[in-house]
């Protein structure tokens, strides 16, 4: 079994999938760290909702966000090795969720104040983390 640590010291750098190294303050590291934070925020929302449909959406989105994080954590060689990259089907999936929500709730004409219930508040936190990741 391999270890999660390398014992080589990092000198302020981290390895990308594919073998190259980048500074830990690079935009890629910041981006995939924020994506990881968004995945965790969605996990909190998942535990707080009772809706099987919302749970299914969240779980699917979390899995695809792991893929997005992997892409951000890859160099060119790593990208060639990755399978199942983020693509048009992922965009369509999200658009379908938005369309269904709009059918049920109508178009939003004003800002929604977070905090109606715990799961809604958690989803708003996740939304803000995702916006930062964008």
Indicate residue ranges for each PLM-predicted region.
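Phosphate/pyrophosphate-binding loop motifs in nucleotide- or prenyl diphosphate-using proteins
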Residues: 1-134
């Amino acid at each position: 079994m391999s270890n999660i640590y390398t014992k080589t010291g990092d000198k302020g750098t981290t390895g990308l999938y594919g073998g190259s190294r980048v500074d830990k303050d690079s935009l890629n590291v910041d981006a995939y760290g924020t994506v990881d934070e968004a995945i965790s925020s969605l996990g909190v929302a998942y535990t707080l909702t009772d809706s099987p449909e919302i749970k299914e959406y969240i779980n699917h989105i979390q899995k695809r966000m792991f893929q997005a994080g992997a892409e951000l954590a890859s160099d060119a060689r790593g990208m060639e090795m990755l399978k199942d990259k983020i693509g048009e089907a992922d965009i369509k999936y999200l658009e379908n969720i938005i369309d269904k929500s709009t059918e049920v709730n109508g178009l939003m004409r004003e800002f929604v104040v977070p905090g109606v219930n715990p799961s809604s508040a958690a989803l708003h936190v996740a939304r803000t983390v995702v916006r930062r990741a964008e």
